[in-house]
């Protein structure tokens, strides 16, 4: 079965960009980060034993997808014709995709994350990320709160204040999803976050864990599949920041909203 058919069967779409969760116009860096994010969710080392076979299959397919979109010639053919060269060396099914992945991405620790959080919160980078997320998601606070790094539900008033000030200063447009968000939606988001925090605390107590980095890591690994995926998604974003190529320089400037 060809790569496109496999993607349709396993991920529900034959669109390689959709498989990685990125736009067709995505830059090389965005494609790389998209691959990192989705591959972390199915990395065989991060799932339970009974899920390893399915995760390994998905992981291998994702590696092949990235191999196409990271190769200029193959990407050009796919963009123009919607086909992939199944005989290319990069799509060899016997390739060690785990070794390939580890060559691309540096592993970081939870200590790295904690150190990053201390410098990130309140920084110019966080400010730009919040405004960018606001533009990307057209003011949808559910998605903004999920996408900005190191954010907890208790940060929402601070995040809203940053966005409101940016709207008032005409830096960003006033999307109705933000300025007219219902209290019902706000309360639902708060309840979800509180339930998740309660679930984490219960899991910690059930495992007899004290608070701390090593125990937090053990707790993350013990959580339910959906929460594991969300944490992996967070780690993917963190690792993407730590793994930026040095020549890539600074983050691209905040996009201006087109009229």
Swiss-Prot record:
Keyword Lipid metabolism: no
Region (Required for histone binding): 171-248
GO CC aspect terms: cytosol; extracellular space; nucleoplasm; plasma membrane; protein folding chaperone complex
Principal location: nucleus
Coiled coil: none
SUPFAM superfamilies: Chaperone J-domain
InterPro entries xrefs: DnaJ_domain, DnaJ_domain_CS, HTH_DNAJC9, J_dom_sf, J_domain-containing_protein
Compartments (UniProt record): Nucleus; Cytoplasm; Cell membrane
GO molecular function, one term: heat shock protein binding
Domain of life where this protein originates: Eukaryota
UniProt record, GO biological process: nucleosome assembly
A Pfam family of this chain: DnaJ
Keywords, sorted A to Z: Cell membrane, Chaperone, Cytoplasm, Membrane, Nucleus, Phosphoprotein
Domain named J: residues: 15-82
Modified residues (Phosphoserine): 109
Record keyword Methyltransferase present: no
Entry remark concerning the domains of this protein: The functional J domain is required for the release from histone-dependent chromatin-binding.
Summary of the function given for this chain in its UniProt record: Acts as a dual histone chaperone and heat shock co-chaperone. As a histone chaperone, forms a co-chaperone complex with MCM2 and histone H3-H4 heterodimers; and may thereby assist MCM2 in histone H3-H4 heterodimer recognition and facilitate the assembly of histones into nucleosomes. May also act as a histone co-chaperone together with TONSL. May recruit histone chaperones ASF1A, NASP and SPT2 to histone H3-H4 heterodimers. Also plays a role as co-chaperone of the HSP70 family of molecular chaperone proteins, such as HSPA1A, HSPA1B and HSPA8.
Subunit structure: Forms a co-chaperone complex with MCM2 and histone H3.3-H4 dimers. Within the complex, interacts (via C-terminus) with MCM2 (via N-terminus); the interaction is histone-dependent. Within the complex, interacts (via C-terminus) with histone H3.3-H4 heterodimers; the interaction is direct. Interacts with histones H4, H3.3, H3.2 and H3.1, but not with CENPA or the testis-specific histone H3.1t. Interacts (via J domain) with HSPA1A, HSPA1B and HSPA8. May interact with TONSL; the interaction seems to be histone-dependent.
Protein name: DnaJ homolog subfamily C member 9
Organism of this sequence: Mus musculus (Mouse)
């Amino acid at each position: 079965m060809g790569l496109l058919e496999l993607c349709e069967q396993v991920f529900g779409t034959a669109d390689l960009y959709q498989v990685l969760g990125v736009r067709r116009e995505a830059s090389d860096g965005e494609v790389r980060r998209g691959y990192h994010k989705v591959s972390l969710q199915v990395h065989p080392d991060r799932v339970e034993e009974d899920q390893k076979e399915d995760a390994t299959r998905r992981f291998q397919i994702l590696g092949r997808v990235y191999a196409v979109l990271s190769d200029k010639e193959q990407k050009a053919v796919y963009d123009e014709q919607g086909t992939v060269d199944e005989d290319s060396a990069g799509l060899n099914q016997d390739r060690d995709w785990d070794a390939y992945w580890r060559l691309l991405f540096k592993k970081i620790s939870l200590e790295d994350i904690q150190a990053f959080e201390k410098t990130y919160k309140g920084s110019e980078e966080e400010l730009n990320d919040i405004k960018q997320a606001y533009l990307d998601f057209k003011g949808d606070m559910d998605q903004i709160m999920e996408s900005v790094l190191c954010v907890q539900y208790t940060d929402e008033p601070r995040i809203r204040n940053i966005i409101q000030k940016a709207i008032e200063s005409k830096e960003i447009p006033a999307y109705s999803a933000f300025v007219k968000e219902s209290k019902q939606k706000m309360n639902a988001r708060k309840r979800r976050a509180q339930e998740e925090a309660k679930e984490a605390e219960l899991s910690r107590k059930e495992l007899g864990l004290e608070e701390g980095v090593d125990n937090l890591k053990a707790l993350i690994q013990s959580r339910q599949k959906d929460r594991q995926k969300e944490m992996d998604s967070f780690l993917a974003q963190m690792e993407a920041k730590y793994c930026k190529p040095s020549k890539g320089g600074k983050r691209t400037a905040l996009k201006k909203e087109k009229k």
